[in-house]
Amino acid sequence: MPKLQLSVAMGDYDRTRALFDGTVQIDGVEPTYMLLSPEEMFFRAFRFRDFDICELSLSSYLVKHAGGNCPYIAIPVFLSRAFRHTAMYVRKDRIRRPEDLKGKRIGVPEYQLTANVWARSILADDHGVQPQDLSLIHI
């Protein structure tokens, strides 16, 4: 029986390299691997449905799924795991603690970006800074 041909888009991570270099095989599948940046991969997946299997932004996936407009099915594999506490950068002449962000303008590339969801949760849960306390600006 011929192997199932599937396109697989993923980032170049230590956690995916064994698939890409062939060390780990997928039984019954002849994959065509594409190493792409997350931005390109997510855009092409959601806009053009370019891949059979791909890494996706969890929050963008949930937005699409909730709207009944997602062609993908999620599986519980998280390729990028990081604490997002160090992912916020502020002007050192104005912000001394997270609570100082209340009422400030904050630039974000996308509201639903998974890292931004984490950051808002950290600010709310750990520091009492609710999303409505911030002025989020699309950059």
Predicted regions and their residues:
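Short, polar/charged alpha-helical segment
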Residues: 9-41
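Pocket-flanking alpha-helical
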Residues: 38-71, 94-96
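Conserved small/polar residues in nucleotide/adenosyl-binding loops
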Residues: 137-139
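Small-molecule pocket liners
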Residues: 82-88
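Hydrophobic residues within well-ordered alpha-helices
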Residues: 45-47, 101, 123
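A short alpha->loop->secondary-structure connector
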Residues: 124-134
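Ligand-binding "clamshell"
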Residues: 27-29, 63-77, 124
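Flexible hinge/capping segments at coil-to-helix
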Residues: 90-106
